């Protein structure tokens, strides 16, 4: 049936017919097979929406319709989905299926199977907790057992059953527990002590004794502080006992704004600091966050340092923050709690704008100040407070003593009988016996109370917290020490590593320099480089000499002694400065090395000058005897083996002087001192040339054993080869001096013929291992002198015959090398 739809303001509704049954297949995809099409179960009806619409021209009460302002209006025009055939709606059918029970095989549990009965299934198992809870804390003594036997006899005569010992112990324990609990409750509450509070008691915050409905005065059951509900922020008075904030936590804190403890206190936001509510109200910088609950205390950090520095005029303490007198000309400072205790005038003024102003006055400006003086009033006030406190304490102690004496009034027999499931008649006998026994023990309990009942639960928790804090603090200190030790150890190891690296670099540079000098053939003259190598060991040779050799060498040793002693006696000024040469290996080439000290160069020159005065010269090359000073100068610069060989040739010669020997003069050399060769080359090469000249002029005796000196020949040949070459080069540069005056020849002969009466010259700088004082001693009279040669020194200082012959042959072609060497 179609209904006429009134005109609607909707454009989309006018275009559509009023009622249309549209199949839901229009909004679905058509089936591929037309035979499979089924009738739709739902249709979209638009007449329901159109019937609800009201035209704009229709006047209707505004309360009877709703204005449709949704922008989703076009979607409403599509219609409402309704079933096509409501009569053919299928009815659901259901059936209940029983749950299938899962079958599981038995699996042995890891733990033992325990029975729920109190008796243990296994004889070895014991539950310690249950056993401790079931164990009675009271043990019967002999008096209790005797009284129990008498009671059982009386109960048997009266027709009651007997009481065993375990039952009596448990009954006495229950009586003690009830007495302890009721006594603690009586001590904590006002009713138990029976203290009647005075009517003139005042609030600890506002100091007002008045109370009104909804703002009653509340007392703390532990510290007995009195506060108004509004002053302390108590929204609802709890039933039973009430404790203040500090008593709830079981602490007795110190106020941060004054030196007093106790009273109506609240915490800061952190909960670590406490302050009196009165102090927070009277100090202008401090405020309270929530006025309804009067907590927490805030803005303590806003107090200026000048207020913290004030000293209280009443308690004379510089603790906390003080307030000052409201009189502008007065600057007297005092604590808020000190002002309350001394009865100063503290006014609270309410302005018209509901603003509260606090006015405080000192002793001088207070209107209700006492007539007594300040000192007298202070002593009087202290006396009154101490008296009131003592009276209050004595009253409380008296009430406690009365409560302890009347302990039996705190226990009800009916409650004990109900808990023990016994008759009141039987429990009454045990109750009377317990009362008599406790009175005989000065009203002390028969069993000690438990630690939880004696100390409470709050205080041990607080102590445990402080203990843990101390433990963590000590742990942090220990960890800090460990960290410091680890840092110091790491720093020490780093320093050691850097030091080792520096030493390694130094060693590497030293080795590099030594390798460079070795490859270039330079001498190791640096003290730091020489410290890396130790000097070669000293070699001492003991040779056996035949008697004929010592006899043949008399003349030679005599002449040698003359030559050795003549420089020391003729030139004493020169003997003070003996040349010192650095150590050199045998195979070192003769080169100008810049590291030689200047002193050694000059000493070599002086040695060459003094040596030229004592040498003889002829046209043919003949062996010459060197001076003792030359050996002393070279003893420190040659190896020990070479020194022994050269020194032996001096000590043991052929015993003959050349007939044509002449004393050389140095005048010609001094005249030609500024020749073609520079002073630096002269001073560095003269010392090497002297040794080469010595080796060429030394005769070699044929009666020395070859077997003892064979190992010296090879090294001596190499040294001679290297020393002869610079001598040849110097031969072409310097001309020898042949003109010698007759006066100088005569002076030289006198020196040769002069007998030596003392030992040979020795250096005063130190010990010389190459020349012994007994090597050149002479004994005799007149021109004939018999030398005394030690066997040990002669054996040590004789070179081989072959080496001396070869050296003499090589140096034979250079007759003027010695004179050129003196430059």
Curated annotation (Swiss-Prot):
One of its GO terms (cellular component) is nucleoplasm. InterPro entries: Enhancer_polycomb-like_N, EPHD, Histone_Mod_Regulator, JADE3_PHD, Zinc_finger_PHD-type_CS, Znf_FYVE_PHD, Znf_PHD, Znf_PHD-finger. The modification Phosphoserine is found at residues 566, 578, 608, 774, 776. SUPFAM superfamilies: FYVE/PHD zinc finger. SMART domains: PHD. GO terms for molecular function: zinc ion binding. The modification N6-acetyllysine is found at residues 30, 32, 35, 601, 638, 735. Pfam families: EPL1, PHD_2, zf-HC5HC2H_2. A zinc finger (C2HC pre-PHD-type) spans 252-286. Residues 549-562, 781-809 have a biased composition (Basic and acidic residues). One of its GO terms (biological process) is regulation of cell growth. A zinc finger (PHD-type) spans 200-250, 310-366. The keyword Repeat applies. Residues 1-40, 543-585, 601-631, 651-676, 756-823 are annotated as: Disordered. It comes from the Eukaryota. Keywords: Acetylation, Metal-binding, Phosphoprotein, Repeat, Zinc, Zinc-finger. Belongs to the JADE family. Scaffold subunit of some HBO1 complexes, which have a histone H4 acetyltransferase activity. Component of the HBO1 complex composed at least of ING4 or ING5, MYST2/HBO1, MEAF6, and one of JADE1, JADE2 and JADE3. This is Protein Jade-3. It comes from Mus musculus (Mouse).
């Amino acid at each position: 049936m179609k209904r006429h739809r009134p005109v609607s303001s909707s454009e989309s509704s006018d275009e559509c017919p009023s009622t249309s049954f549209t199949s839901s297949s229009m909004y679905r995809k058509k089936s591929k097979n037309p035979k499979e099409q089924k009738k739709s179960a739902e249709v979209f009806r638009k007449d329901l929406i159109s019937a609800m619409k009201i035209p704009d021209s229709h006047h209707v009460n505004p309360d009877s319709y709703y204005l449709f302002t949704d922008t989703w209006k076009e979607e409403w025009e599509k219609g409402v989905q309704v079933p096509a055939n409501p009569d053919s709606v299928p009815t659901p059918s259901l059936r209940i299926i029983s749950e299938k029970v899962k079958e599981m095989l038995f699996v042995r549990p890891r733990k033992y199977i325990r029975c729920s009965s109190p008796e243990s299934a296994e004889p070895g198992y014991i539950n310690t907790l249950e056993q401790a809870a079931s164990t009675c804390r009271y043990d019967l003594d002999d008096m209790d057992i005797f009284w129990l036997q008498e009671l059982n006899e009386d109960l048997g005569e009266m027709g009651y059953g007997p009481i065993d010992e375990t039952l009596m112990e448990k009954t006495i324990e229950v009586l003690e527990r009830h007495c302890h609990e009721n006594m603690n409750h009586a001590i904590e509450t006002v009713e138990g002590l029976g203290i009647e509070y005075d009517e003139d008691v005042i609030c600890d915050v506002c100091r007002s004794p008045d109370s009104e409905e909804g703002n009653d005065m509340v007392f703390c059951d532990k510290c007995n502080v009195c506060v108004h509900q509004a002053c302390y922020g108590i929204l609802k008075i709890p039933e039973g006992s009430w404790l203040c904030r500090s008593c709830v936590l079981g602490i007795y804190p110190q106020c941060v704004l004054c030196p007093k403890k106790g009273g109506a206190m609240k915490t800061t936001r952190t909960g670590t600091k406490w302050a009196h509510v009165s102090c927070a109200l009277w100090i202008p910088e401090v405020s309270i966050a929530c006025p309804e609950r009067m907590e927490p205390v805030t803005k303590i950090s806003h107090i200026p340092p000048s207020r913290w520095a004030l000293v209280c005029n009443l308690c004379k303490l510089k603790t906390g923050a003080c307030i000052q007198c409201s009189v502008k000309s007065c600057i007297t400072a005092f604590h808020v709690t000190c002002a309350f205790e001394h009865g100063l005038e503290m006014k609270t003024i309410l302005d018209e704008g509901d603003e509260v102003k606090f006015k405080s006055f000192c002793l001088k400006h207070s209107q209700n100040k006492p007539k007594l003086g300040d000192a007298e009033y202070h002593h009087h006030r202290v006396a009154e407070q101490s008296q009131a406190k003592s009276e209050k304490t004595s009253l409380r102690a008296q009430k406690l003593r009365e409560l302890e004496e009347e302990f039996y009034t705190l226990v009800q027999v009916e409650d004990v009988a109900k808990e023990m499931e016994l008759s009141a008649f039987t429990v009454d006998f045990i109750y009377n016996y317990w009362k008599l026994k406790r009175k005989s023990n000065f009203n002390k309990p028969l069993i000690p109370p438990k630690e939880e009942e004696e100390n409470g639960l709050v205080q041990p928790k607080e102590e445990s917290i402080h203990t843990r804090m101390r433990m963590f603090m000590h742990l942090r200190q220990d960890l800090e020490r460990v960290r410091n030790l680890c840092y110091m150890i790491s720093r020490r190891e780093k320093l050691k590593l850097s030091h080792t690296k520096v030493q390694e670099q130094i060693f590497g540079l030293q080795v590099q320099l030594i390798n460079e000098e070795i490859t270039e053939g330079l001498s190791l003259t640096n003290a730091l480089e020489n410290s890396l190598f130790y000097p070669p060991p000293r070699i001492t040779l003991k040779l056996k000499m035949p008697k004929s050799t010592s006899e043949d060498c008399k003349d030679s040793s005599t002449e040698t002694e003359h030559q050795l002693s003549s420089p020391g006696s003729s030139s004493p000024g020169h003997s003070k400065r003996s040349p010192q040469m650095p150590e050199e290996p045998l195979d070192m080439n003769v080169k100008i090395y810049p590291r030689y000290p200047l002193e050694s160069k000059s000493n070599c020159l002086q040695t060459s000058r003094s040596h030229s005065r004592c040498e003889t010269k002829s046209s043919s090359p003949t062996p010459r005897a060197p001076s003792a000073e030359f050996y002393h100068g070279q003893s420190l610069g040659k190896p020990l083996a070479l020194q022994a060989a050269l020194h032996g040739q001096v000590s043991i010669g052929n015993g003959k002087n050349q007939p044509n020997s002449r004393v050389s003069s140095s005048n010609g050399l001094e005249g030609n001192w500024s020749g073609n060769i520079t002073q630096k080359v002269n001073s560095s090469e003269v010392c090497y040339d002297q040794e080469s000249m010595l080796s060429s002029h030394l005769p070699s005796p044929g009666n020395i054993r070859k077997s003892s000196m064979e190992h010296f020949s090879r090294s001596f040949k190499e040294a001679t080869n290297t020393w002869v070459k610079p001598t040849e080069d110097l031969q072409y540069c310097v001309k020898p001096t042949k003109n010698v005056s007759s006066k100088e020849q005569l002076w030289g002969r006198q020196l040769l013929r002069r007998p030596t009466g003392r030992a040979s010259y020795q250096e005063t700088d130190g010990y010389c291992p190459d020349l012994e004082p007994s090597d050149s001693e002479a004994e005799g009279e007149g021109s004939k002198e018999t030398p005394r040669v030690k066997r040990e020194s002669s054996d040590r200082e004789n070179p081989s015959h072959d080496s001396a012959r070869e050296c003499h042959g090589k140096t034979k072609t250079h007759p003027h090398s010695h004179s050129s060497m003196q430059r």
